[in-house]
């Protein structure tokens, strides 16, 4: 009886080790998805708790004062707002189209997400087009009754599945108005800071955006380093030199390298810890089994 109990415990340890090992590998591979690198910096003002009141002109003046104007090829801003009415967005037709798709785990995740997205963020198309231009992508075109669906990469488990739903051009409701979703889902990062995330948003014409948000929004100002500077020094050196000058200005910032370093630390920590535990469990189980054979 004692040996059978020990064998059962060892089996559980080995099973747990295999589960942990699989989880560790999944964490490492699942978080290594390709993110299109466009922005090098996102700026904030040191005196402010958030950057809602920071505008592009203020950033340009501070960069000029710090002698950094020539080091940036482009400074752009993106407004992000919410409908002035609470729970004003309905994805009912999107959910219906999604239910018609082949069943999968990702389908259930997306269904839950769209059901919860009744207060989705809104983004003006002109400013998102500036981001697309920086990424060497063609601009988006919209009429007053059309919108593009935006989903952050971290919240987009299956881009092909979402695009297959959008092919039907489903209509959504925003503050009681019918809006047709067109094109493919958009997912370019609007800031370098991964702590600022958007799950689901709508890209709207500028006039529609201002009307639905009642001109109340957050403003995110970002910068792109000059290509010649990056080519000459390399990205890490260019950002390091720029950081030294930025540290002497009133602007606080998040750089692409800082963000990547933080994300890499999280991924390595999570994956290594689970794999390490898996190895410990395997060693303990094998030791117990070995001792039993020696007795």
Describe each model-derived feature in a short phrase.
Residues 28, 34-280:
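Basic-flanked hydrophobic alpha-helices used for secretion and membrane insertion
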């Amino acid at each position: 009886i004692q040996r059978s109990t020990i064998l059962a415990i060892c089996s559980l340890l080995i099973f747990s080790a295999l589960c942990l090992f699989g989880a560790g590998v999944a964490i490492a591979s699942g978080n290594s998805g390709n993110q299109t690198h466009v922005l090098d910096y996102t700026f904030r003002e040191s005196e402010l708790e958030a950057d809602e009141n920071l505008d592009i002109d203020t950033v340009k003046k501070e960069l000029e004062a710090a002698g950094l104007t020539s080091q940036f090829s482009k400074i752009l801003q993106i407004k992000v707002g919410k409908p002035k009415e609470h729970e004003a967005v309905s994805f009912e037709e999107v959910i219906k189209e999604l239910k018609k798709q082949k069943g999968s785990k990702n389908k259930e995740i997306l269904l839950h997400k769209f059901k919860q997205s009744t207060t989705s963020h809104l983004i003006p198309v002109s400013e998102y087009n500036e981001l697309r231009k920086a990424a060497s992508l063609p601009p988006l075109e919209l009429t007053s009754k059309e919108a593009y669906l935006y989903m952050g990469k971290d919240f987009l488990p299956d881009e092909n599945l979402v695009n297959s739903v959008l092919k039907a051009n489903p209509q959504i409701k925003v503050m009681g108005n019918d809006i047709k979703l067109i094109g493919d889902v958009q997912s370019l990062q609007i800031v370098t800071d991964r702590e600022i995330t958007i799950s689901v948003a709508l890209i709207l014409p500028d006039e529609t955006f201002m009307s639905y948000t009642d001109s109340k929004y957050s403003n995110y100002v970002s910068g792109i380093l000059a290509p010649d500077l990056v080519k000459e020094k390399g990205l890490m050196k260019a950002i390091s030199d720029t950081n030294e000058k930025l540290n002497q200005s009133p602007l606080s910032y998040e750089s692409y390298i800082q963000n990547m370093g933080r994300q890499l630390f999280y991924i390595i920590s999570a994956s290594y810890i689970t794999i390490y535990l898996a190895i410990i469990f395997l060693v303990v189980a094998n030791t117990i089994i070995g001792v039993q054979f020696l007795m």
